[in-house]
Structures are given as C-alpha cells and as structure tokens.
Regions:
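N-terminal secretory signal peptides that target proteins for export/translocation
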Residues: 1-12
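Bacterial N-terminal signal peptides
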Residues: 15-27
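Extracellular, beta-strand-rich glycan-interacting domains
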Residues: 38, 262-278
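Extracellular glycan-recognition surfaces and repeat-rich motifs
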Residues: 44-76
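Secretory/extracellular carbohydrate-interaction modules
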Residues: 76-149, 273-275
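Short, aromatic/His-centered strand-loop micro-motif at the edge of beta-sheets
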Residues: 150-174
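Localized edge beta-strand/strand-to-loop motifs within extracellular or lumenal beta-rich domains
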Residues: 171-187
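Flexible glycan-contacting loops in extracellular carbohydrate-active proteins
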Residues: 200-265
C-alpha cells in the first residue's frame, strides 16, 4: 500500500511524485525492494515516475509482444535513416543514488544498431543531450562503449570513453552497471561477465562548447560563438565531474550515421539500487 500525506496543498504531479518517493523509500528501508524498479507490467508508462524525451521520429511505447519476463516491456522504435533520439527519464530518485549507484536492465536489440556513436542509457544532469552524464552506449553499433560526456552549455566539451565487448543481438541479455561520481567511474557486466569499464581518467577538452541538441549534428559540433580563452578548461582528474546524478535515462540516440534499416531496442526489469543487483529471480 502507498501512503501519501502532503503537509500542504500541492499540484497533482507534485503529490504523485512525493507519493512515489515515499513508497520506494519505505520499501528500501524495510529491505523489501531496491531503491527503484520498473517492470512495465502496468502496460503503460507511469507519468508520475517517467517523463518522455523524443526528437525526430523515434518512438517510445510499452508493448506486450517482446518481453523478458512477465507480459510487458518498453520498446524504442527507430525508423530507417533517423538520427533522432527517444528516452524515458526518471528524475525523482532519492539522494541515496545521487553520487553512486548500481543498475540492471534486460535489453533486446533487433536486428542491430547503426554504426557510429550510439547511446543506450545515461545518468547525469537535466537537459540531455546538453548536460553532463555518464553513459553506456555502443561503438560502431557493436561494442559496449562507456563514457563521460561533458556536454552542458557554456563549458568546454569533453568525451572520455572506453570500449568493451560485443553486444548480444537477437536475444534478451542482462546488462548491469555501476556509476560513480567520486571518482567518476563506469563498470558494466553482460550476463554476469565484465563488459567494459572506464576509470582513472583525466578530462581533456576537445571543443570550446557543447554539441547542439540537433541530432543531425556531430557529437563534437561547436557553437558559432567562441568562448573566451580564460574559460577554457585545463586538464583535470576525473572526479566529481557530473556533480550528482539527477536524471536517469533509458532509450536510444544515434549520433552518427542514420539507421540503414528499422530497428528496435527493448528494456525490461529496470532496477537501480545502492548495491549490485544481479539477475532477476
């Protein structure tokens, strides 16, 4: 049962968000549930939990045809030729996962991802893609690529990455990860095995400003107005770069070449917690 006890009048959205936070916090304290979980079994997106971010013709739906467990899963559909993005974003999670957390999701890639820089999930500041975040994506549409992306407005651009193993395609697989902001670090596992890791890095600016939100622009595209030389960032250690995870996003974004054919990314059984989650039981 979920209890909601507002101390003063509030909007329906604010009340729903507070109710959501209260429910997951109490469950966590009792040891009955992780900090956050979503299995999509309601058959639709809970608007008190998720907001949808879409640009172009990529779409987000909850469907019942391709599922890992239960009867429903999230589908990101990407049409041929598109360079757009579509994500579901949770932004009301407790402070317990603001600087360090573990995650797990079941993914299904069909039939494959487009070549280039692909984004699957990330956590960072609001306003994606003009934001700072840690990311799990793909390199060349095939290999795990983990990265720190410094894309917020009016600061030097940075992209620091590491490549890992090949993604499975045409089947469900269990993706686990650990995101940490002090120091900044990304660790991933696929079906329980190490898949890719980014750690012990330094920030080396690549461009004066962040990329434009236009998905047709390259990831390192720059604004026309240059930043003053004094504002350019010197090389710094990779720690406290994100400055806290406030938005947790799941979906797909193709920065590079457009898709050569229609494809779909499915998500199921998403969990975020303060300890490693492991496979669904």
């Amino acid at each position: 049962m979920i209890l909601c006890l507002p101390s003063r009048p509030r909007s329906a959205t604010t009340a729903a968000s507070a109710c959501f936070l209260f429910a997951i916090s109490v469950a966590s304290l009792r040891g009955q549930a992780p900090v956050f979980s979503e299995d999509f079994e309601s058959g639709s997106l809970n608007q008190a939990v998720w907001k949808t971010t879409e640009l172009g013709n990529a779409t987000v739906t909850v469907q019942q045809t391709q599922v890992a467990h239960g009867k429903s899963a999230l589908q990101i559909h990407y049409p041929q030729g598109e360079k757009s993005f579509a994500f579901v974003v949770a932004s009301h999670l407790p402070d317990a996962v603001r600087n360090h957390f573990f995650g797990r999701a079941y993914l299904y890639i069909s039939p494959t991802m487009p070549a280039g820089h692909d984004v699957l999930l990330n956590a960072g500041t609001p306003g994606y893609p003009i934001s700072n975040f840690l990311e799990i994506g793909a390199s060349g549409g095939k290999n795990v690529m983990v990265s720190y992306q410094q894309n917020a407005a009016n600061i030097p651009r940075n992209e620091t990455l590491a490549r890992g193993i090949l993604y499975p395609v045409g089947r469900w697989f269990c993706l686990e990860w650990e995101f940490q902001d002090h120091p900044d670090r990304v660790t991933t596992w696929i079906d329980g095995e190490p898949a890719g890791e980014l750690k012990d890095f330094v920030v080396k600016p690549r461009a004066p400003r962040a990329p434009k939100a236009d998905p047709k622009a390259k990831a390192d595209a720059t604004e026309t107005a240059p930043m003053p030389a004094a504002a350019l960032q010197t090389e710094v250690a990779g720690t406290d770069l994100v400055k806290g995870f406030s938005d947790f996003s799941f979906g797909f974004h193709a920065w590079g070449a457009g898709a050569k054919e229609d494809f779909d990314i499915y998500y199921d059984d998403i969990v975020i917690d303060t300890k490693r989650v492991g496979p669904a039981k």
